[in-house]
């Protein structure tokens, strides 16, 4: 199915998808889980609703033939760069190419918005995930950022640091 812009009516389903891809038992069915690193939710509906009120933020979604959202990606214009975050694919569909399609759609949006670079942060000890992004042309910039945990979204089970990855479009 085509990748399109999500709308506020998608918030409940987006919240379920994103949390199932990152946290809790359901996330362990896929390879992108953070459940071993962080407790709690990845996102809540209130925060997602706020994103739709920001003109610099776009959330793309992929739907299956029944209309169910199976993948999503958060995009935020940050000057000449497009930040890619909350990249989510249903744990049951990971490894089938949907992630590559979502990244390609993000690159297309970057060009349309006049951005020349995709940028993202990844937990530094997620080596398999970093390798996946590197195979898709992303490179570590050498920059690191602290991981800020919000009590609303659980606690880190160990110290966490983020690395910045970028790719020209």
PLM regions with names:
Residues 119-123, 130, 134-156:
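Conserved catalytic-core motifs of GNAT/GCN5-like acyltransferases
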Residues 2-16, 23-24:
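A short beta-loop-alpha structural element at the N-terminal edge
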Residues 19-48:
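Conserved GNAT-fold acetyl-CoA-binding loop/helix
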Residues 43-60, 83, 158-161:
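A short helix-loop-beta-strand connector motif used in the catalytic cores of GNAT acetyltransferases and
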Residues 89, 95-108, 135:
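Conserved acetyl-CoA-binding loop-helix of GNAT-fold acetyltransferases
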Residues 80-91, 100, 121:
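Conserved acetyl-CoA binding element of GNAT-fold acetyltransferases
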């Amino acid at each position: 199915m085509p990748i399109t812009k999500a709308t506020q009516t998608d918030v409940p389903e987006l919240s379920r998808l994103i949390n199932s891809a990152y946290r809790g038992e359901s996330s362990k069915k896929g390879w992108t889980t953070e459940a071993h690193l962080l407790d709690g939710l990845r996102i809540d509906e209130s925060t997602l609703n706020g994103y739709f009120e920001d003109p610099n933020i776009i959330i793309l979604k992929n739907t299956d033939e029944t209309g169910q959202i199976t993948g999503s990606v958060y995009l935020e214009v940050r000057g000449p760069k497009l930040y890619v975050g909350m990249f989510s694919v249903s744990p049951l569909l990971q490894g089938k190419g949907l992630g590559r399609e979502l990244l390609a759609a993000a690159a297309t949006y970057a060009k349309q918005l006049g951005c020349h670079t995709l940028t993202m942060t990844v937990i530094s000890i997620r080596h398999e995930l970093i390798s996946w992004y590197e195979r898709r042309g992303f490179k570590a910039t050498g920059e690191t950022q602290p991981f800020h945990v919000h009590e609303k979204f659980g606690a880190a089970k160990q110290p966490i640091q983020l690395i910045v990855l970028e790719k020209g479009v």
